[in-house]
Each structure stands twice: as C-alpha cells, then as structure tokens.
C-alpha cells in the first residue's frame, strides 16, 4: 500500500492585511497546485484522493482530482490544528507577534497549542484516530496490540493521495513511522507548499510496516516557486 501526502499550495493568509483562519490559495498557490497535479500521473494508478475540508487543501486537491479522474473525498480529521477564533480578522502583524510569543513558552506549555486554539494533544489524537479509521475502511488494520506500528495490509497495490497540511501530514508521517509525538511536528517534518511525501508498506515478519520513501519533493516547481 502506498500513501502519498501532498501539502496544500501557498495560501493568501491576509489578503487585506487582516488574518484569515481558513484562507484560499494565493495566485502562486494555485500555480503550485496545477504543477503538482500535472505530475500526478507519475505516481502510478491512484485508487482514492482524500482531502482536508479547508479551502487551501480543497483548492490544491481539485486539479489533482481532475488529473486522476477521481473526485476528492473530504476527511474532516485532516483539518489543520485550529487557530484561536479571535485571530480571524486580526491585523497580520499581531498574529506574527503572537506566534513569536507562543514559541518562547516553556516546552511543556507547547502541548497546549496556541492560547485559545486547539491543543496539540487534541489535534494529534484527532488526526491519528481519523487516519486509523480511514485505513480500516480500506481493510488496513493494526497487526495486534503488541505491535501498534505493524499492519495487516490486504492489498499491497492500493495507492491513496491525501491533500492536507504541514501539521496534519507531519502527524501522519510520525505516527506511521512509530515516532514519539512532539508538539513541533511541523518542524520535524517540514514540507514546502505542494511538497510530496510517499510512504509505502513493506513486509516485516507477518505484518507490514510503513517506510518513508520520498519527502518534501517539489521537483514539479521551478526553484523560484518553492515556498514554505
């Protein structure tokens, strides 16, 4: 089984200098999305395209759906960690300062997420539980309780694309590789906009384990188009 993770294109975070919690893609972001869709045929036959419900993920998934002939399916669990509600419409400079202040807190406080937003603990649990449930619908289940990172995979030829976010995709990668979670997953697995990661299963004893084969691939972009 192969899981292909695509981060969304560059968003227009503050089109009028005021922040948006669920922004649309920028002009460059739309171009990045069209470029990654243009190379989807190189990934091999795709069975399903999944996407986060956020605008930037939907708008990145749309051309991939057109390229593959598949209708992207919304998975609510793939939503990025939720920003504080009060950030919506706030001056962008205030948001930048809030990020700086939040990152200066003690490490133990980082698990609480941004003040007023979703905690990292809740975010991690949401993504992992949603991922495990989505895989189960494909018949992919954990081998047993003693080996949580080994899986029963009935069809090694399955291939699924998930279009989501830096945080969501990082949690997915960390969990499938068996890495201990940290509240800085975004930095541990930092992917550029429309960066592609590919995880595939390989035989380990009587089960299958996920192996990270490609990460942060932006070969579909010109160098000046690469953004983080």
Range-by-range predicted roles:
Residues 35-104:
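Phosphate-coordination/substrate-recognition cap region in phosphate-metabolizing enzymes
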Residues 4, 9-64, 116-130:
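Loop-to-helix element that buttresses phosphate recognition and phosphoryl-transfer chemistry
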Residues 100-122:
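Short glycine/proline- and acidic residue-enriched helix-loop micro-motifs
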Residues 9, 166, 216-218:
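Active-site metal-binding loops of divalent metal-dependent hydrolases
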Residues 81-93, 140-143, 148-159, 174-228:
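Acidic, low-complexity terminal tails and accessory targeting/binding regions
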Residues 2-7, 50, 154-164:
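Beta-strand elements within well-structured catalytic alpha/beta cores of enzymes
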Residues 133-141:
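Phosphate/ATP-binding catalytic cores across multiple sugar-kinase/actin-like superfamilies
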Residues 166-170, 195:
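GST superfamily/GST-like fold recognition
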């Amino acid at each position: 089984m192969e899981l292909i993770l695509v981060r969304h294109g560059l968003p227009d975070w503050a089109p009028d200098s005021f922040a948006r919690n669920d922004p649309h893609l920028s002009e460059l972001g739309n171009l990045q999305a069209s470029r990654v869709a243009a190379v989807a045929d190189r990934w091999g036959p795709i069975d399903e395209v999944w996407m986060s419900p956020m605008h930037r993920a939907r708008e990145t998934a749309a051309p991939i759906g057109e390229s593959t002939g598949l209708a992207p399916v919304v998975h609510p669990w793939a939503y990025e960690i939720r920003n504080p509600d009060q950030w919506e419409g706030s001056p962008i400079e205030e948001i930048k300062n809030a990020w700086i202040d939040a990152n200066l807190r003690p490490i133990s406080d980082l698990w609480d997420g941004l003040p007023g937003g979703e905690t990292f603990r809740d975010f991690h649990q949401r993504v992992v539980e949603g991922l495990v449930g989505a895989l189960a619908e494909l018949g992919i289940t954990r081998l047993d309780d003693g080996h949580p990172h080994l899986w029963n995979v009935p069809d090694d030829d399955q291939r699924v694309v998930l279009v989501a976010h830096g945080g969501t995709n990082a949690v997915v990668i960390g969990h499938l590789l068996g890495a201990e979670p940290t509240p800085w997953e975004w930095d541990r697995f930092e992917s550029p906009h429309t960066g592609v990661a590919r995880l595939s299963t390989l035989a380990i004893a009587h089960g299958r384990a996920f192996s990270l084969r490609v990460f942060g691939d932006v070969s579909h972009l010109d160098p000046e188009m690469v953004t983080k």
